[in-house]
Amino acid sequence: DNGGVRANRRKAYIRGFAYPFISKYVLDETLPSLSELTIFSYGFTEEGYLLAPHLDDTFMIEKALSNMTEPILTLTPFDRSGNFSNELISKVVNNQDAIDTLIAQLLNTVKNKGFLGVDIDFEYIKATDRDAFVKFVRQITETMNENGYSVSVDLAPKISADQPGLLYEGKNYGALGQIANSVLVMTYEWGYTYGPPMAVAPINKVRQVLDYAVTEIEPAKINMGIPNYGYDWPLPFVRGTTKAKTIGNVEAVRIAIENNATIEFDETAKSPYFFYEKDGISHEVWFEDPRSIKEKLELIYEYNLRGASYWQIMQLFRSNWLLVDYNFNVEKIKM
């Protein structure tokens, strides 16, 4: 017996995103299984001034450090009203004064608050800002690394270099993967709020993305995204009208039990789903369970990845963390 862990268990970096309104209990239960706690999120102004989250995140930083987990500052293009803005990205990445201000502010905040790194989570970058964004990431990474802090970049799930679409065109996978210390490939949201019912992270789609990612970026730098949530769709699905409800994975099982639903398993997506009826409305639910998680964690071994990044850890999914600890020796801060 090897102490209840898999033979030849390897090291991996396990990261989890969380908002400052996370319950202290959930945070305490999850941190032992995390290498990095990615705190969501810091915005900024057009001049490059950092905007802290509305709620204080100090307790998260302290708890992370006491668990030998690295607290990471997530930088997002959120404006003063908390809205995502790709106009804001354009204005800042093309303005050296704003970049200098933002880097100084980031460094100051990271030092003063006790963060150990920065995660750059910019989405929908314009194709015309592609090169400016690379330069922006390079400047942040150089300054942070010189001061002993790491930088990661989040990447949309591409399957080819010239993939069209707003999510993809502004991200130069190869260049960003070379510059950043690590990347998160966001392998989830195939099933999403406004889309048709399907698995959030079907393994066949995840594989396609990883197959491409490892041609551009060294696997030792890649964290694959794993969703810690599911969706409940009212049926029939009507595009533009139907809106799925986000649910937790434990909650999904509870809904199935309460409605006497049979949980099925899709062998192509390697994901669980079920149908139920309530108040005369049919529903279709897709979520993650220990089987789907096990399939995803296996990919870290198969592709030799850095590890996994969970969006997000707000709801406790205990069986997931047991699987993580069984399969990986989770990297922790070296003292």
Regions found by a protein language model. Give the residues of each.
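Short, acidic/polar
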Residues: 18-33, 95-111, 165-174, 287-301
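Active-site beta-loop-alpha junctions enriched in small/polar residues
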Residues: 19-21, 42, 76-78, 123-125, ...
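Conserved, mostly hydrophobic/aromatic
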Residues: 37, 120, 183-185, 224, ...
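Substrate-binding surface in catalytic domains of secreted glycosidases
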Residues: 46-56, 104, 130-256
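Glycan-binding loop/region signatures in secreted carbohydrate-active enzymes
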Residues: 77-89, 228-296, 326-335
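Active-site-adjacent "subsite" loops/lids of carbohydrate-active enzymes
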Residues: 79-108, 112, 161-166, 184-188
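Acidic/aromatic/glycine-rich contiguous surface patches that form carbohydrate-binding/processing clefts
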Residues: 296-335
